[in-house]
């Protein structure tokens, strides 16, 4: 389900969008435009996402579950209500300790024009 923005608003109940796979990752792009993309990630317990980077800034907003994010070498416990900002090109990895759902927002990296 991807919704391209055609009106000024979009509303959904995130908990109704959650779908856990038996193993691994299920992701669903909820909304995107030229500057941002909003993707719901549902990870089955014991799922690992190996270290990688992104050319875009990102935020993680945890909806439910528990996991561990390693961001630029720092371990961050992910649990309901946690919000994390990840700058573009920051190395990060993730392990879902139990079923874990979060909203990932990708946004354009702002270039310093000075």
Predicted regions and their residues:
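A short, N-terminal "cap"/entry segment at the start of jelly-roll beta-barrel domains
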Residues: 1-35, 70
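Glycine- and acidic-residue-biased ligand/ion/polar-headgroup-sensing regions
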Residues: 56-68, 72
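Short acidic-glycine-tyrosine-enriched beta hairpin
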Residues: 73-88
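Ligand-binding loop in jelly-roll beta-barrel domains
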Residues: 88-111
């Amino acid at each position: 389900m991807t919704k391209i923005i055609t009106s000024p608003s979009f509303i959904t109940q995130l908990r109704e969008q959650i779908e856990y796979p038996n193993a691994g990752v299920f992701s669903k792009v909820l909304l995107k435009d030229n500057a941002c993309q909003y993707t719901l990630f549902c990870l089955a317990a014991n799922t690992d996402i190996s270290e990688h980077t992104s050319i875009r800034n990102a935020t993680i907003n945890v909806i439910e579950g528990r996991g561990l994010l390693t961001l630029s070498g720092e371990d961050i416990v992910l649990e309901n209500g946690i919000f994390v900002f990840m700058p573009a090109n920051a190395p990060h990895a993730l392990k879902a300790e139990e079923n874990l759902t979060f909203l990932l927002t990708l946004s354009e990296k702002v270039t310093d024009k000075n």
